[in-house]
């Protein structure tokens, strides 16, 4: 029977993923802290997951950061409400947990540290002295779960208004607006909200002036053409010079992670498109790969190549908008209109294949929505013949312009050490000389079968970042040409019980297959209780999904790590001492959208 088959498949280990319990770092940890110091959790994340005691946390992280091949980046930090989780066999008792995901460039390996917390002692020491980018992550973890980080420089709300009450990612917090009392905005409440947004320099350790003169405090945004979305930066100015600044985010926050707890594994796919709304199918990739790890699904080669093709089309589309708007921020208007002509050709191709343009929601658990249509190859070939010359025109007409180069070269530069400290990935990291591209270093969806280069820079400035994007478009065109020439034959879905939706023809076999199809489409597939993780090279850096299944049709915890979030946190450290005009160029060079930051 189909139900028995699902049970058998669920018992198998996930494909192409290992717990890495034999990772050399485990031996190093045991040798230093003792064989019984930790609880090791088997997962389908593909990385060691180690539970450490609260009092050992900073010592363990310091040890990992000082190893001969160190774990130099705090890739992610967040929490989980463990109180309603039923499948916790072998794990330390916990009401809540906080995880620290560390990354080593030299090892090309990760490790995840977890700390169990009781509701009565919901506190941890801050990790900001070790990893400065822990600042925002700890603020968000306190905001969403109520975990207090002792010693944090400014533990306050980050995604939600200052007046918000409660911790939304707790399991006892309502997930729908209809579960709250009707919202009413009185004049008194409106005044209170506006007062709460008033910037008070003293709360951020800023002085209002010197003995001789006052500083100016200026709001850039949240509605400003150069802030690239609903994003506010409070500038502390001495004339035109930026003494300090405070990025203020959250205006675009939609509760994407909370939504993951009430959507089925299948019905959450459209939400992934909207995390970074320019990325389209790129955003779907880490989510469906993480779910497929939970399910133990290996997709056909044709599916892998189709996914790569759609991802690279969206990468080009996003990069073209970035390149043209960067030029616009510096003062050149014409390339924006050129770019929209070129992007229209990409959208026409995407629409012909998927039926939609910006948000196709086209990848599926175990495959894609449908096979490639007749004529897709002709459309792709026409685009590949068109784009290279157009790309050259951007470089010749604008990016080699002496005025643009004068505004961008040497501006907002940082080195590789600083990039790693702040969790910078993507072109922002590669511009400092580190060729870390997940498609090359940790291939997924068959990227190991494609021939392409990873461009790098040397100066880590605005000009390096934009020129890297130009070269990345060229490399994406190379990948697309290989997709065109070497598209495998075969099915567009995996033959697996948890492929969703299941192949329609199965419903015609007997009543069990019809029941299974009905349940998977209406309620969603039941994923084995476990944890999985997948990172990918998205358009703006590394995007990842960390999924926790409790053996049901919905995710127990969906953690979305986006690249733009740490990139904006880095702004003050880079731009202090520069001019306001340099900040505009720097913002244009980061490549971010606020949906990616705020989720």
From Swiss-Prot:
Residues 214-599 are annotated as: NADH dehydrogenase I subunit D. Gene3D superfamilies: Cytochrome-c3 Hydrogenase, chain B, NADH:ubiquinone oxidoreductase, 30kDa subunit. Its EC number is 7.1.1.-. It is found in: Cell inner membrane. Disulfide bonds: none annotated. It catalyses: a quinone + NADH + 5 H(+)(in) = a quinol + NAD(+) + 4 H(+)(out). Keywords: Cell inner membrane, Cell membrane, Membrane, Multifunctional enzyme, NAD, Quinone, Translocase, Transport, Ubiquinone. Pfam families: Complex1_30kDa (PF00329), Complex1_49kDa (PF00346). In the N-terminal section; belongs to the complex I 30 kDa subunit family. NDH-1 is composed of 13 different subunits. Subunits NuoB, CD, E, F, and G constitute the peripheral sector of the complex. HAMAP family: NDH1_NuoC, NDH1_NuoCD_1, NDH1_NuoD. NDH-1 shuttles electrons from NADH, via FMN and iron-sulfur (Fe-S) centers, to quinones in the respiratory chain. The immediate electron acceptor for the enzyme in this species is believed to be ubiquinone. Couples the redox reaction to proton translocation (for every two electrons transferred, four hydrogen ions are translocated across the cytoplasmic membrane), and thus conserves the redox energy in a proton gradient. This is NADH-quinone oxidoreductase subunit C/D.
């Amino acid at each position: 029977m189909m139900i028995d088959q699902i049970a058998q498949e669920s018992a198998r280990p996930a494909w192409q993923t290992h717990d890495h319990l034999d990772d050399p770092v485990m031996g190093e940890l045991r040798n230093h802290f003792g064989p019984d110091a930790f609880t090791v959790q088997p997962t389908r994340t593909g990385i060691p997951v180690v539970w450490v005691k609260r009092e050992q946390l900073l010592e363990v992280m310091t040890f990992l950061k000082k190893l001969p091949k160190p774990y130099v980046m705090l890739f992610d930090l967040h929490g989980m409400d463990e109180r309603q989780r039923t499948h916790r066999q072998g794990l330390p008792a916990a009401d809540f947990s906080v995880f620290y995901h560390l990354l080593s460039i030299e090892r090309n390996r990760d490790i995840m540290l977890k700390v169990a917390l009781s509701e009565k002692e919901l506190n941890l020491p801050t990790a900001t002295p070790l990893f400065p980018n822990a600042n925002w992550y700890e603020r968000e973890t306190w905001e969403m779960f109520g975990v207090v980080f002792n010693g944090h420089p400014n533990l306050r709300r980050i995604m939600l208004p200052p007046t918000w009450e409660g911790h939304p990612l707790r399991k006892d917090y309502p997930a729908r607006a209809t579960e709250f009392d009707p919202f009413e905005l009185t004049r008194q409440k409106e005044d209170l909200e506006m007062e709460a947004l008033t910037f008070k320099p003293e709360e951020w350790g800023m002085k209002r002036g010197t003995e001789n003169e006052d500083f100016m405090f200026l709001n850039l945004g949240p509605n400003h053409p150069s802030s690239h979305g609903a994003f506010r930066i409070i500038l502390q100015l001495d004339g035109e010079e930026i003494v300090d600044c405070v990025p203020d985010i959250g205006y675009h926050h939609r509760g994407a992670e909370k939504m993951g707890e009430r959507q089925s594994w299948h019905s959450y796919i459209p939400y992934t498109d909207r995390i970074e709304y320019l990325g389209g199918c790129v955003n779907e990739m880490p989510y469906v790969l993480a779910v497929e790890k939970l399910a133990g699904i290996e997709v056909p080669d044709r599916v892998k190549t189709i996914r790569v093709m759609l991802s690279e089309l969206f990468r080009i589309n996003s990069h073209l908008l970035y390149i043209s708007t960067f030029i616009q921020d510096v003062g050149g208007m014409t390339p924006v209109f050129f770019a929209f002509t070129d992007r229209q050709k990409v959208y026409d191709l995407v629409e012909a294949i998927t039926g939609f343009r910006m948000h196709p929601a086209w990848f599926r658990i175990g495959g894609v929505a449908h096979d490639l249509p007749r004529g897709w190859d002709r459309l792709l070939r026409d685009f590949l013949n068109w784009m290279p010359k157009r790309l050259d025109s951007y470089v010749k007409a604008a990016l080699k312009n002496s005025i643009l180069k004068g505004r961008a070269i040497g501006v907002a530069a940082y080195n590789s050490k600083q990039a790693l400290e702040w969790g910078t990935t993507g072109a922002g990291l590669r511009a400092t000389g580190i060729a870390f591209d997940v498609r090359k270093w940790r291939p997924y969806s068959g990227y190991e079968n494609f021939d392409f280069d990873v461009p790098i820079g040397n100066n880590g400035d605005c000009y390096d970042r934009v020129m890297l994007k130009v070269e990345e478009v060229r490399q994406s065109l190379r990948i697309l040409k290989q997709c065109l020439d070497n598209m495998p034959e075969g099915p567009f879905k995996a033959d697996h019980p948890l492929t969703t939706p299941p192949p329609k023809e199965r419903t015609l076999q007997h009543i069990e297959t019809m029941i299974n199809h009905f349940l998977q489409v209406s309620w969603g597939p039941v994923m084995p209780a476990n944890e999985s993780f997948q990172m990918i090279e998205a358009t703006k850096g590394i995007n990842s999904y960390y999924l926790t299944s409790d053996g049901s049709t919905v995710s127990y915890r969906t953690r979305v790590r986006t690249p733009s979030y740490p990139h904006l946190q880095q702004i003050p450290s880079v731009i202090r001492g520069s001019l306001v005009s340099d900040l505009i160029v720097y913002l244009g060079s980061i490549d971010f959208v606020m949906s990616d930051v705020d989720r």
